[in-house]
Each structure stands twice: as structure tokens, then as C-alpha cells.
Design a protein with these regions (language model features):
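Active-site-adjacent helical/loop segments in soluble small-molecule enzymes
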Residues: 56-125
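Glycine-rich phosphate/pyrophosphate-binding loop at beta-loop-alpha junctions
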Residues: 1-66, 116, 121-159
């Protein structure tokens, strides 16, 4: 985020941070609106194990709170949908084998574009059918059994 903000200081990209709902410390900090980070405690159970920290990195918090357009707290079905979409893409798109934490971006983009629940967010960040989106999947198939349950058995359905 810092890199792209410095690269395009007059017209930076729109940044969206996605977190597992069970461990949404950055989202909670942004929601509080006082500039202070938040720690989420308790049961951090989520399929997005790589995002289940519950405590923000203090050094990055300042950059995030100043340059991110939206923080989104995502339920597990968002990640599962992203895994399915990446793993079984539409004709012509490449297959991407992404784990739960890496696929949340794809699932969120789909939810933002396809559901009224995210209409306000879609408008706030200026996302439309002409937008160019760059996503990073930071995780491969780290749990083959869970991957199969999500893709083959429909675990965490969207409907």
C-alpha cells in the first residue's frame, strides 16, 4: 500500500483490506474512528487461519488507516466462494488454486458486484464493471482436505 501510494501520489489506487470476521482487528480499529488499533480476543475460529491474528501490526496500522479506502469484515462464505470461483473459473480464465486466506479477495469482489448488501461499499469505492482490479492471493492449498470440502462438497455455501 505504501509502495503504490508513493508511486502514484496524486492519484493513488483504491485499497480495500479484507479480514476474517472472527478476527477483524483492523476493521474494528477503522470502525472506532479514533485512529487507535484494536485487538480482537476470544474465539478466532475461521477457515481463514492465515488471517486469524486478532491483533494488528502496529507499524503497518498507521499506513493502513491513512491510505485504505475500506476495511471489510468477511464471513467465511466469502472466502469459500472465492476459492470456488478461482478453482473452477469461467471459460477462458486460468485456474488458480488458492487457500482460504488468499481467496477472500475474489469472493469479496464477487459479493460487492453481485449483491445489494454491498451496494453502498461498491459505490463508496467507485467499483463498477469498468474497474480494473488487482488482487493478491497470498496462499496456496495449505489444507488439501479443507480445500476439497469447500470445492467438492460445498462447505460454507453462499446461499
Amino acid at each position: 500500500i505504501g509502495y503504490f501510494t508513493n508511486l502514484f501520489p496524486n492519484d493513488p489506487p483504491t485499497f480495500v483490506v479484507m479480514e476474517a470476521r472472527a478476527a477483524d482487528c483492523l476493521y474494528q480499529g477503522a470502525l472506532a474512528g479514533d485512529g487507535q488499533p484494536r485487538i480482537v480476543e476470544g474465539d478466532l475460529k475461521t477457515i481463514m487461519a492465515g488471517l486469524a491474528c486478532g491483533e494488528p501490526n502496529i507499524l503497518s496500522w498507521d499506513i493502513l488507516r491513512n491510505h485504505v479506502s475500506a476495511f471489510v469484515s468477511c464471513p467465511d462464505w466469502v472466502s469459500a466462494r472465492g476459492m470456488r470461483m478461482l478453482g473452477v473459473p469461467v471459460k477462458g480464465d486460468p485456474t488458480v488454486i488458492s487457500g482460504e486466506s488468499g481467496a477472500v479477495g475474489m469472493g469479496l469482489i464477487a459479493a460487492i458486484m453481485e449483491t445489494d448488501e454491498y451496494k453502498e461499499l461498491r459505490e463508496a469505492i467507485g467499483l463498477d464493471r469498468f474497474s480494473q482490479v488487482l488482487m493478491f492471493s497470498t496462499e496456496g492449498n495449505t489444507d488439501p482436505m479443507k480445500f476439497r470440502k469447500v470445492l467438492w462438497d460445498g462447505e460454507y455455501p453462499t446461499v
